Amino acid sequence: MSLSTQQLAAQKNLSYVLAEKLAQRILKGEYAAGSILPGEMELGDLFGVSRTAVREAVKTLAAKGMLLPRPRIGTRVMPRSHWNFLDKELIAWWMTKDNFSHVVEEFLIMRNSLEPQACALAAINSNEQQRTRLAQLMTQMTELQTAFDRQRWIEVDMAYHELIYEMSGNPFMTSFANLFRSIYYNYFTAITDNEVIKLDLHQAIVDAITHGEEQAAFDACLALLKEPVAHR
């Protein structure tokens, strides 16, 4: 790798780190919506980076709807209604320890709206291979009841729900599961204790999908999502 290429890669890394730092400040309200960010030189001095790194960081956040650069005016912080919360990096920056509960709350509202419909669609659109795979995952979940492995349960549970979105046959729903994988993982990790979770309701979804019962699949998923997780 040539020196110029190394420098370019280092510059790119610096701009990403700066974009994350600026995003965190914006998310915390330190740079409020409607305010103008400090200029390139001031930000460069503040974070110890070049003006090029600042410009690239601003471009990154502008692409996510967080900033709006304007000549002779400066870079304005945009209101949250303009932010692209479907951006994986923005989700990761938002989902800090302090924000986790709020992010999950917002995520579950979206999940509760989509996943029952995904189950209903899976009952009518899935193929035999997908249904077989879902049954296999259900078997693995059942086996974990007698020999529980927390990390393995999280992996299988995630695979189960991701597969249902795929089985729906709707590309937007499949993308939803892929996009929010990090939130799913952190959420399932948070709610999983030392035992299987709602095994009967997971089975009810599998049974309904297997038999092509659209409404039953929808209702079973709704029951799964609405029943609170009990910890012992």
What name fits each language-model region?
Residues 1-113, 120:
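Short linear motifs at protein or domain termini
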Residues 10, 14, 106-110, 129, ...:
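A generic short alpha-helical patch detector that favors 3-5-residue windows
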Residues 31, 112, 124-131, 147-150, ...:
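Alpha-helix boundary/capping and short turn/kink residues
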Residues 79, 106, 133, 176-179:
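Residue-level recognition of specific faces of alpha-helices
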Residues 85-91, 95-101, 129, 150-152, ...:
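Inter-domain helical "communication" segments and dimerization helices
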Residues 86, 92-100, 110-126, 139-143, ...:
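Hydrophobic, amphipathic alpha-helical faces that serve as interaction scaffolds
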Residues 135-138, 142, 147, 155-156, ...:
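C-terminal all-alpha effector/ligand-binding and dimerization domain
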